[in-house]
């Protein structure tokens, strides 16, 4: 009968186990893919003391138990050792055809992962507590709740790929961020009808800002995203059918300059109905466009909203415009100031106004270009005391 192998303490070693001359234990095995692998440990069992000067790590028998479980579950022993950065890069490579804005967000997250200790960790060692600590570090660095939540969503998607590929069993990013970090995102508030009229009246009569009256009116009466408004050309206004055709947006970056992009989602491609007031505003815009050299971007020209040099305006131009405009208004109306207003505030106001008038949700979803009806339905939940009063009066009259 063949004598069983023993370690330096006289203990019988199991199949695949051995002990080197320096005292370190070794386990040889074949993984789920037929590859020969080795693991090492200074301790044979969990109760063995760690040799002096050596790091505290799992014993060989603990490693064997994990290996057997991985083999039984078909876990990829190589794949689980990839770092979080490598996993995120793998996910991005599988979905390479994305918008430039999405690509910039990806680059930001990859840069953050490389700067953070979590990025170099192998994915099989990342626990929910590690993911939560990462979120807290992002908060300490000054990132907003929404930014952290978006990055968390991306990493959660990455781990689902790892689960599907049998690299890990669980998703450490499958938790609610609001349980870790307070959601301090300010609720977007629509302008009241009085504020809307006050803004329009001020712009119309102001000697500086009157030239932007039509821009603001069109935003208020169409609910367009600011990048969609900036991208409008003469050909996009269909006066015969009284609609504006939305099939692109105009953006600008430091790296690339001006560029044309498709709408935010497929639902963003739409035709927005125009009121008589809005049609007249578009006609005035066309009439007062400065005569300048043709400016063509990605094959599109004759942009409607341009500066004095004939170059198209972009979102940042309007953002700064609204800051200055509201500041001047509030300087002369200290008793009844306007809130902080952005171009998106006007889109929010347009949607809220139609929702409060009980427009068919599916029709409003189409006009707004929302990809999901749940986004549209949120606006119907934004009741105010004024709309509540009118509804009560209507129902009990």
Specify the residue positions occupied by each region the protein language model found.
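Short, Arg/Lys-rich segments that mark the N-terminal edge of DNA/RNA- and chromatin-recognition modules
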Residues: 1-44, 248
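Short, aromatic/basic-rich helix-turn unit that serves as a nucleic-acid recognition element
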Residues: 12, 35-39, 46-52, 83-111, ...
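Basic/aromatic-enriched alpha-helical hairpins
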Residues: 69-75, 86-142, 158-161
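Short, basic (Lys/Arg/His-rich) helix/loop patches that form interaction surfaces
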Residues: 145, 201-212, 272, 288-303, ...
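Basic, Lys/Arg- and aromatic-enriched nucleic-acid-binding interface segment
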Residues: 149, 164, 168-232, 240, ...
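Conserved tyrosine-mediated DNA breakage-rejoining catalytic core shared by Y-recombinases
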Residues: 232-290
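Short, polar N-cap/turn motifs at the start of nucleic acid-interacting alpha helices
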Residues: 236-243, 359-378
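DNA/chromatin major-groove-contacting recognition/catalytic segments
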Residues: 255-260, 357, 378, 382-397
């Amino acid at each position: 009968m063949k004598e069983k192998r023993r370690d330096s303490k006289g203990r019988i070693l199991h199949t695949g186990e051995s002990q080197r001359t320096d005292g370190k234990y070794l386990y040889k095995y074949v993984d789920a893919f037929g590859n020969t692998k080795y693991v090492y440990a200074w301790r044979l069992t969990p109760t063995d003391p760690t040799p002096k000067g050596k790091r505290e790590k799992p014993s060989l028998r603990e490693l064997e138990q994990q290996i057997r479980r991985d083999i039984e579950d078909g876990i990829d022993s190589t794949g689980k050792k990839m770092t979080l950065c490598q996993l995120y890069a793998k996910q991005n490579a599988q979905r390479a055809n994305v918008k430039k804005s999405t690509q910039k967000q990806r680059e930001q997250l990859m840069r953050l992962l490389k700067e953070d200790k979590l990025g170099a960790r192998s994915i099989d060692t990342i626990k929910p507590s590690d993911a939560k600590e990462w979120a807290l570090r992002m908060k300490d660095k000054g990132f907003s709740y929404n930014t952290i939540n978006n990055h968390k969503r991306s990493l959660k998607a990455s781990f689902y790929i790892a689960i599907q590929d049998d690299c890990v069993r669980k998703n450490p990013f499958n938790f609610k961020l609001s349980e870790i970090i307070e959601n301090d995102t300010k609720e977007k508030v629509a302008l009241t009808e009085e504020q809307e009229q006050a803004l329009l009246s001020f712009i119309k009569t102001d000697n500086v800002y009157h030239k932007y009256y039509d821009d603001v009116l069109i935003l208020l009466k169409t609910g367009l995203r600011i990048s969609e408004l900036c991208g409008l050309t003469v050909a996009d206004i269909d006066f015969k059918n009284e609609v504006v055709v939305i099939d692109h947006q105009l953006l600008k970056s430091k790296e690339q300059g001006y560029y044309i992009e498709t709408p935010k989602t497929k639902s963003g491609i739409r035709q927005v109905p125009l009121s008589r007031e809005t049609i007249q505003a578009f006609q005035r815009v066309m009439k007062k466009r400065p005569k300048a050299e043709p400016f063509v971007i990605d094959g599109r020209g004759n942009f409607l909203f341009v500066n004095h040099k004939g170059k198209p305006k972009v979102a940042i131009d309007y953002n700064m415009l609204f800051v200055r405009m509201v500041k001047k208004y509030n300087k002369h109306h200290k008793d009844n100031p306007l809130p902080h207003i952005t171009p998106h505030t006007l889109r929010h106001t347009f949607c809220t106004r139609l929702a409060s008038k009980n427009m068919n949700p599916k029709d409003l979803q189409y006009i707004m270009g929302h990809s999901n009806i749940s986004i549209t339905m949120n606006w119907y939940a934004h009741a105010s005391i004024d709309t509540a009063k009118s509804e009560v009066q209507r129902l009990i009259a």
